[in-house]
Structure formats: C-alpha cells, structure tokens
Amino acid sequence: MADIGPSFAAHAYRVRSSAFDLLALEDLLGKEASNYVNKYLRLKATFIYYDFDKLITAADPDARPPLLDLANRLFDSFEKLQAAVTTKDDADIGSCYADTKLILQEVMTRMA
C-alpha cells in the first residue's frame, strides 16, 4: 500500500469499515428489504469508490495494477448484486452476494 500520509489511514479505514458493513448486510438479503439493501449498497459503494480513487491515485506506479484489479472486480460484483436485488430473485441474490463477500474479505485483508 502507498503511504500518502495521515489521509492514507483514513481512506484505508473507511474502505475497510464500509466493506465490513456490507459483509454484515447478509442478514437483510431477501425480498422484504430489497429497497433498503439497494440504497445501502449504493451508499457504501460511493464511499468505497471515492476512497479507492484516492488510494490508487497516490499509490506507486508498481502498486496500482493490483489495486485497480481489486477495485474493478469489487465494483463489477456490486453491479451484479444490485441487479439481482432489483429483480428480487433470492437465488440470484444469494449467488451474487457470495461472490461479493469473497471480494469484500479480500478488500479487508488488503486494507489492513
């Protein structure tokens, strides 16, 4: 990870805490809470996007490709999960969330 001073810790912490919050979202998945889940996912994705942008921009050129790959996989997964939540198909939501969960755990490990 690039060290961009005091703000690095703040950006990495917010990425980590947003990922943790999204991991806790598993209990709410389902048709009843789909509107809430969709809004919460968009909110947390916005925070993560902003902080990843700051971290990637400040990273050394050699450290950027792994961060870009991780961010791209995460946001692709978010898009699939959001589409599944919108359709309210429980099987699809579970499948997409399982994929997203693995990437979120990787994000938490990388930002530690």
Question: What do these predicted regions represent?
Answer:
Residues 29, 33, 59-63, 85-89:
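Short coil/turn residues that cap or connect secondary-structure elements
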Residues 38-43, 64-72, 91-101:
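Short, charged, amphipathic alpha-helical segments
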